[in-house]
Amino acid sequence: VSSIIKKCNDFGAGGVSVAIGELADGLVVDLDKVPKKYAGLDGTELAISESQERMAIVVDPKDVDTMLGYAEEENLEAVVVAKVTEEPRLVLNWRGKDIVNISRAFLNTNGAHQETQVKVEVPSKADNYFDSVKEPQDIKKAWLDTLSDLNVCSQKGLVEMFDSSIGAGTVTMPYGGKYQLTPTQTMIAKLPVLKGKTDTITMMSYGFDPYLSSWSPYHGSVYAVVTSAAKIAAAGGDVSKIRLTFQEYFKRLGTDPYRWGQPLAALLGAYDVQIGLGLPSIGGKDSMSGTFNDIDVPPTLVSFAVDVASYMDVVTPELKKAGNVLVEMDIDKDENDIPVYENVLYMYDLLNKKIKEGKIQSAYAVGFGGIIEAVSKMAFGNKLGVELEDTVSRRDLVAKNYGSIILEVKASDLDQLGIPVKKIGKVTKEPVFTYKDVTITMDEALAAWTKTLEKVFPTESNVPQTEIKTGLFDAKTVYTSRNKVAKPKVFIPVFPGTNCEYDSAKAFERAGADVQTIVFRNMTAQGIRDSVDAFAKAISDSQIIMFPGGFSAGDEPDGSGKFIATAFRNAKISEEVMKLLNERDGLALGICNGFQALIKLGLVPYGEIRPQTDDSPTLTMNSIGRHQSKMVYTKVVTNKSPWLKKAELGGVYTIPISHGEGRFVASKEWCEKLFANGQVATQYVDMNGNPTMDEYYNVNGSYYAIEGITSPDGRVLGKMGHSERIGQAVAVN
């Protein structure tokens, strides 16, 4: 498809006039052809209304039908709305009349020349932001106050609402360590490839301190860039490869020269640091409308740093081992508190080399909460302790030393490290933080860190805890297909909202299967009829059906998986499904959204497509009432299913989950029946391998900690955990 696209642009603010208007010098746009979400829009509204999740593409006239055909295959709406013309004019036609007809030369002037007076206020030395950090007197109070600060506190309840493992290429999960409590500063993922493997990764981080920017927009921009670069360096990236993009947001400027001074100072700072570090900003977005009545936003320039590297060079921030040493790597600053850029590049380059040599065990860029924030968050993930040196000053504990990085190194590597550092402490086995005669327990620190946003973005729902004793089911025989196939065919149906088909297909192909994916097209009646026929044919040609995860039809109507189940109840499709299972000894698998479809169809636990009854097992909203995305432990508790043939009975596996409706609910009688029949495939377990109702492990509150179930003979398996999202260098933290 990409080979016939000559140019493309995504829709956003400005709508048609911008997304299409930027594609060529000469254009005639037919606004009547533009798809509308609702009726009643006039020509101006059609031309400038913001629209999302649309793309404008340019193709050769001879390729139009081909492109429209590709779009139809993917169940995408595509229409011809404009033509490129030789005459350099932008023409917008509505209801047979030209409502806009402007020369490109005029548009390229960017409007009339305008000037304004600008006055930049020099930041007050008396109110120097860096000097305003006072030496804490009560260390324990300062420690806990720092961790509970809104700029430092845990955002786990918010982060888990977003799918962090889709694509099976997430190198570092948002929270790392055994307890998944050390926040990752840099988003790292492998490049998505449909075929083959890659060790190439992308890295992305950000930097911004609104309080620093309020004191000095110039310094705010400088340290936004430096902080974003420091986080990349701490993760193992080569800072010299970074490219930047800025997000700017300022108060309404009007004609006040001093108000204009803020964005000018911010941009001057951003320019200075770009020149100093040799790192260009190649994208961004800005807004000058940050005023409501007498309320103004702080001067805002957020720096996003993007880099490329190999996953073999990645370092994660959670502390690794007791006995290791903690050191701080500082950067030089001049008399105006501006980083010495040559030193920044030198230090980060040294760090990159030592990371590649394997000398750095973990690293964390110092942020808003100083050393206290850095060492605490590094310790949380594996619940190791930190003993700080007496030589660390009280002020250093809370100093906002942006650009500095805390490193964990082996004691044996310290003298030969080759980086100018100062020792600040060591990692201890006992989960406590100590500084001189002050001790903060891990529980105290975590309580302070997690409490701030718990009511807004909860991580617990206080579901009653009950003990679960269910044991293992050791089947004497496992169903074996009579039809031997060297390369089984797998059919993966794709519905609107499905997003796991690529991961699922790759997993099956790695295992040696021949995979066919078909998109269910529901935009027209004919599309539905054709899809039904295509699905029926694909099922008849296959030995396995795999229902992938996602959010089919946005989890509507009335619950997830229902759209898929409705489609598969079609007589043609359901007949072929039952033939596959009953006549050809086929298999079926459903993961996440696919499990929801299987259970609504009746394929689990009944083994056949049949209506649900009032007491049928089902999947419902997570007990916490929101989407959950994290890693969980699941235990294989039966060997009855062919799907579990290579799994160890009683074995515990770490897999990602990502769902909002994954809570398995069934009556006591049904649950006892499923366990007795060996139909409970997997259960959520704690770190000791015990099934649990503790929602730290049983994230959705499933009854009896059930994660997956099978049909009576084990050939149909439904489970919530994304077993397909596996791969080399995935979730390394």
Task: Indicate residue ranges for each PLM-predicted region.
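Glycine/proline-enriched, intrinsically flexible loops and inter-domain linkers
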Residues: V1-G554, A567-M578, N700, Y704, ...
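Residue-level marker of motif borders
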Residues: I5, K231, I360, L587-A588, ...
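Short acidic/polar capping segments at secondary-structure boundaries
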Residues: K62-D63, E86, K333, S412, ...
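Short amphipathic alpha-helical segments
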Residues: G69, S504-A505, P557-S560, L601-L603, ...
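Short, basic, glycine/proline-bearing loop/turn elements
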Residues: T255, E335-D337, P557-T566, T682-Q683, ...
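Amide-donor transfer/coupling interface in amidating biosynthetic enzymes
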Residues: I424, R529-D530, F535, M578-K579, ...
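Active-site neighborhood of phospho(di)ester-bond hydrolases with catalytic His/Asp-centered motifs
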Residues: P548, G590-I591, K719-G721
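Cysteine-nucleophile active-site neighborhood
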Residues: S552-K640
